[in-house]
């Protein structure tokens, strides 16, 4: 089998990226994967653009290495490519909500075993404009915090970086209000809210048990 690793070298604390050779070695030595290509992203939407160029049967599967943002990019690109190539996720971000929800392995041996079994499943994906989201779409209070936390803060503090910045933002967020118009099938209503979320899993922002 042939696979492509699309790796975000800036995700999370960079710990997984430093040990990526161990994951690749396990696949080569203990599965029927005999060809592995790697692609390191260089900036925003680079993973999307690489995945969008894929063609049917070019690879047997793709491995996305990064956090939730990287996963969303690559899924969007795969959908645009219409290649229907299966995607494996190697969580290497700060929070990794979607991988946690799916209970995906994060050690070389467990990841190897998952690939060896090669059991695929279909998942839903949400769309907003021309981008998809695998885990959550949100707006309102703290919804932009993922864009405000710097790479240096994530590397230094891990998930705690989001809470630190959240506390800093709290005073300006308290008075926030959105007027929402919601239409789903035959249901239509309006509501004022400080925050809204459309979730595809029960794990959001590092918190388990959020009802999708």
Where are these regions (language model features)?
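Glycine-rich beta-strand-to-loop/alpha-helix junction loops that act as flexible
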Residues: 9, 65-67, 90-92
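Glycine-rich phosphate/pyrophosphate-binding beta-alpha loops
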Residues: 138, 142, 197-212
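Short glycine-/acidic-enriched loop or helix-start segments at secondary-structure transitions
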Residues: 16, 73-75, 99-100, 207-208
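ATP/NTP phosphate-donor binding region
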Residues: 1-62
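Catalytic core of DAGKc-family lipid kinases
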Residues: 41, 80-197
